[in-house]
Amino acid sequence: MKDVFSTVIFIMKEEKRMKKKILSAALLSVLVSSALGIVTAGAVYEMDEVSVTADREGDVAALPGGLVNQTAKLGILGNKSVMDIPYSEMSMTEKTLETFSDPSQPLANVLQNNPSIRSSTSSPMYTDFSMRGINMNGNHMMLNGIPSLFYQFNGPPNHIIERMDITSGPNAGVNGVSMSNNGTNSGATPAPGTINIVTKKAGLTPVLNYTQTFSGRSSFGEFIDVSRRTGANSEWGVRVMGEYMDGDLALRHAEKEEKNIFINLDRKGETSVTNIFAGSFDLRVNKGQRWFTYGGRSDVLPSAPDSNTDYDFDGTTKWMHGWLLTVNHEKELNGNWSWFVNWGVNRRSGNKYNSSSALKFDEKGNFMSSNVSNAQNEIGTNSYFQTGIKGKFHTGAVEHHMSLAVDRSGAKYWNDTNNSVKGNIIGNLYDGTAYTNSFYIPQLRKAKLSWSEINTGITLA
């Protein structure tokens, strides 16, 4: 009985000790928590400076592989994601040009990487191509958003191009007015679509490049590319690009000589962006005209000729020189709206001696053409001005993007074509052409004003 009583007393003492321990632990926890709370509330911490950078909406970035961009310029709407553009859109990068271009050949050889475009000439004398089956040429290209600064004979040199925004589909409503006299087809923005050439600008990394090329039979080219940025925040940039090329092309007896120099000056301020591009060019192509039409039976075709065959008469040549200038400026008015101005002007002159139309042949490859040789002297000027506003606003939860622009384009063209007496062209696809005595080189005459044109428009998009 005594042992049982002792055991009970021991258990009661142990319970008292446990309660004291639990009470002590609880009090200690409260005191520690209070102390920590006081330290946390009273301390001041200074974090290291954190810089956050991001691409502004609409900036251009290449997709994986580097051949096409994920954004493109859509007329007065500016740079947009290709997923937000309601047309078939492709923006080819500088890498695409470096991969697929031949400096001695027209730009159409690169453009045909777009499924909407096919090259429609093998002649270095022309920039012809087709988009969705409609013939186009250098006249239909835009330069930094300015239309009609290139021609059927000369297009933009490959080495000045940063990217090419190709919009397939009827999008004249976002590009403003254009000239109706533009070579193969009228209008710089016809139904098939538009091609906007964006020139190279100075990047943050300085560039000093000298490049040599060899193509064709003996065409040797030299290129320079120099760029720098300066200013307290690298806001000013300058890039100089030049080319000299001379030699024989892949087509036998065809020669090309090209000289040009261009400069791109840009400024990126806190609330405005300005870009100025200017340069001069001089291009001559001797021989190399390739225009053929088939006039034989529809169920028979002649065998393919040797590509070395010469189809030009002696003295065939085409030459053009001139200059151009574009100015683009955009000023941010507030967080939602901005004002923009686009202006461009050019002047070119040149002459040519060539046969005036295509060589027609039958199912045996024999030529069946009558034609004339001609001497043409031409001068042309184009000008363009556009100003407007663009921005965004909300109606409830819906965000709207809108642009309003007024533009005016003008052009003048002086021309004189002196034709020889009409004569027959004999020969065939395999032995070449034989021209009658009437195919002589006529004398060049002074160009006269042929036409002038002014267009004004308002664009809301």
Model-predicted segments: where are they?
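Face-selective signature of the C-terminal outer-membrane beta-barrel domain
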Residues: 325-348, 371-461
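Short acidic/polar hinge/loop motifs at secondary-structure boundaries
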Residues: 119, 128-130, 146-176
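Transmembrane beta-barrel wall of Gram-negative outer-membrane proteins
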Residues: 207-209, 214-294, 315-332
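A beta-strand signature from Gram-negative outer-membrane beta-barrel systems
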Residues: 159-209
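Non-catalytic regulatory/gating segments with a bias toward low-complexity or hydrophobic composition
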Residues: 89, 97, 109-111, 164-169, ...
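N-terminal Sec signal peptide and the immediately downstream disordered periplasmic leader
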Residues: 2-102, 108-115
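Outer-membrane beta-barrel and related beta-rich outer-membrane complex signature
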Residues: 252, 275-311, 350-359, 369, ...
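Outer-envelope beta-barrel architecture signal
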Residues: 43, 160, 204-208, 220, ...
